[in-house]
């Protein structure tokens, strides 16, 4: 997904001090944000002009102590064709030399009242989300008790119907059919719907329904971290399934591993309730309580007691 300067302006509510419509449509190539410190002294080795240039109190203070000529020279060298924009935080005064250099080089000048570190974090979060490489997977992504659960399985097994039942039980739909996943970092996976499928569920025999229209805004979510994969598969009498919950299986999506739980599906089984329980049990494990481990300890103690009674 490409991101323009205008999209960034709208998302983090920046003020446009200078920028034609053409300049605001310039694409941002990287999520990295530069705080030009050494560049202010004239040291431009390893300078990354393709990044958003963000000036906070320290950079601004140093810049304002320069002579007008030196200030213009530094800014002129800093502003290059591939530079998307320069942003001044904290509503600090924009030097005239900055506007002059920006107009000459064709660089948008933006301003924000937000403190520098917070502004940098907001922009990084947004740009990382937009510019991260995406992988499309088949399934239903639900927010269950605040945890992102990716429901997968063979076609026709009832993933969308299960998603609808979970919505009726108070959980939130993120995406149905196609889920676009991307890595926020090495350990964090996020998912979102394809734009054309946002808020929609396809139910066999009924057709396409708009979950937001039928159940309200509280029933949908635009994106979610993906923390758990539930794989639905047809129940087979002779097939072995994990009965104790101590079988560890992971899947890797966009370079991030997440745990997977396989749930057998057969007529009469309330799959949505089972998925709720699986999600809550996984969260309990993350908080340090493992029911399987507790059971195994009780079983071991019982065996030890029986052996002691026979001695």
From Swiss-Prot:
SUPFAM superfamilies: HprK N-terminal domain-like, PEP carboxykinase-like. It catalyses: [HPr protein]-L-serine + ATP = [HPr protein]-O-phospho-L-serine + ADP + H(+); [HPr protein]-O-phospho-L-serine + phosphate + H(+) = [HPr protein]-L-serine + diphosphate. Keywords: ATP-binding, Carbohydrate metabolism, Kinase, Magnesium, Metal-binding, Multifunctional enzyme, Nucleotide-binding, Serine/threonine-protein kinase, Transferase. Residues 264-269 are annotated as: Important for the catalytic mechanism of dephosphorylation. One of its GO terms (molecular function) is phosphorelay sensor kinase activity. The keyword Zinc-finger does not apply. The keyword Protein biosynthesis does not apply. Homohexamer. The Walker A ATP-binding motif also binds Pi and PPi. PANTHER family: HPR KINASE_PHOSPHORYLASE (PTHR30305:SF1), PROTEIN YJDM-RELATED (PTHR30305). Belongs to the HPrK/P family. This is HPr kinase/phosphorylase. The gene is hprK.
């Amino acid at each position: 997904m490409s991101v323009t300067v205008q999209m960034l302006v709208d998302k983090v509510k920046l003020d446009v001090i200078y920028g034609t419509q053409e300049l605001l449509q310039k694409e941002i190539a990287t999520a990295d944000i530069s705080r030009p410190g050494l560049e202010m002294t004239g040291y431009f080795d390893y300078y990354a002009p393709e990044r958003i240039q963000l000036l906070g109190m320290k950079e601004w203070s140093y810049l304002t102590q320069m002579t007008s000529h030196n200030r213009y020279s530094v800014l002129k060298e800093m502003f290059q064709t591939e530079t998307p924009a320069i942003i001044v935080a904290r509503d600090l005064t924009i030097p005239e030399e900055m506007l002059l250099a920006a107009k000459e080089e064709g660089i948008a000048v933006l301003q924000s009242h937000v403190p520098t570190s917070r502004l940098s974090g907001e922009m990084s979060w947004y740009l990382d989300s937009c510019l991260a490489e995406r992988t499309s997977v088949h399934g239903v992504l639900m927010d269950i008790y605040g945890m992102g659960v990716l429901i997968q399985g063979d076609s026709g097994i009832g993933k969308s119907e299960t998603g609808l039942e979970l919505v009726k039980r108070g959980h939130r739909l993120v995406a149905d059919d196609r889920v676009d996943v991307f890595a926020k970092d090495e350990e964090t996976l996020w998912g979102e719907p394809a734009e054309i499928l946002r808020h929609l569920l396809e139910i066999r025999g009924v057709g396409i329904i708009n979950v937001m229209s039928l159940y309200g805004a509280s029933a949908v979510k635009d994106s979610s971290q993906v923390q758990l994969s539930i794989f639905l598969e047809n129940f087979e009498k002779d097939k072995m399934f994990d009965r104790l919950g101590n079988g560890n299986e992971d899947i890797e999506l966009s370079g991030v591993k997440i745990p997977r739980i396989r749930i057998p599906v057969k007529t009469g089984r309330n799959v949505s309730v089972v998925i709720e329980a699986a999600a809550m049990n996984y969260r309990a494990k993350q908080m340090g309580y493992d029911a399987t481990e507790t059971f195994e300890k009780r079983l071991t103690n019982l065996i030890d007691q029986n052996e002691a009674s026979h001695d």
